[in-house]
Regions:
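Short, Lys/Arg- and Gly-enriched loop/turn segments at beta-strand edges
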Residues: 27-36
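Beta-strand/loop nucleic-acid-binding surfaces
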Residues: 1-12
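OB-fold and OB-like beta-barrel modules that bind single-stranded nucleic acids
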Residues: 14-27
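Short, conserved beta-strand segments within well-ordered enzyme catalytic domains
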Residues: 1, 20-22, 35-37
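Extended, charge-rich, solvent-exposed interface segments
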Residues: 10, 37-103
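A short beta-strand motif that forms part of the nucleic acid-binding face
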Residues: 3, 38-40, 188
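Short glycine/threonine-rich loop/turn motifs
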Residues: 82-211
Length: 211
């Protein structure tokens, strides 16, 4: 597999997983050898993917990444909220509407791909951005996207993201997928919300109840 192709594979290889490889067979004339030029790698079946996730979950749990005692406390009245999500689509619109209706608060949006090959890097950079931001820093970060297939949500199960969330100095709320979707991002975050709209309701008070 050529180095230039690796970033486009959308998969992190680990010992024990089964994959399907697509490519083309060529000959290496100087040594009379055949070689397979890898162009695409995908997981072989959802069952294999679930097995991989369960193994990863157990290993990270044993290392303490999901311990409740290590969760950071979220302010009851956050002055500003950082949002890592797609800058277009229903999710960000729902969040803005819910914040406006519930308890108007300053929002800082970090545009991110929430699916595909750029998703993981974008979200990690978003977390880093809010953590090093000195001016107008935020009190809490929401990572949000709508529902999707198991493969669509795989970036939110990556070990690199788990470690980045764990090390964040700012509390993080995971609002990934629908109510039945669970990711490793949910387990390591300081709070898990079943939906992006629910995340707002969980961290912001209702002004109608306060007045």
């Amino acid at each position: 597999c050529w180095r230039s192709v690796v970033p486009r594979l959308k998969i992190n290889l680990e010992d024990g997983i089964k994959v399907e490889i697509k490519g083309k067979v060529t000959t290496y004339s100087q040594q009379s050898k055949y070689q397979l030029i890898v162009q695409q790698i995908v997981f072989e079946g959802e069952g294999n993917l679930l097995k991989l996730l369960e193994q990863r979950k157990r290993r990270l749990a044993e290392l303490g990444f999901f311990d409740e005692s290590k969760k950071k406390e979220i302010s009851k009245f956050p002055n500003s909220i950082g949002i890592i999500t797609s800058e277009s689509g229903a999710v960000i619109k729902d969040i803005i509407h819910r914040v406006s209706d519930r308890f108007p608060t300053k929002l800082l949006i970090y545009p991110s791909n929430v699916q595909g090959e750029k998703c993981l890097d974008d979200i990690i950079r978003g977390i880093e951005y809010f953590n090093i931001k000195k001016d107008n820093s935020v009190d809490v970060i929401i990572i949000a996207r709508g529902g999707g297939s198991l493969e669509d949500l795989m970036p939110f199960n990556e070990e690199l993201l788990v470690k980045k969330i764990f090390k964040s100095k700012i509390p993080i709320v995971s609002a990934v997928g629908h109510e039945t979707d669970y990711t490793l991002c949910d387990l390591v975050s300081d709070l898990r919300a079943p939906t992006p709209s629910a995340a707002v309701e969980m961290i912001l008070p209702n002004r109608k109840e306060i007045l």
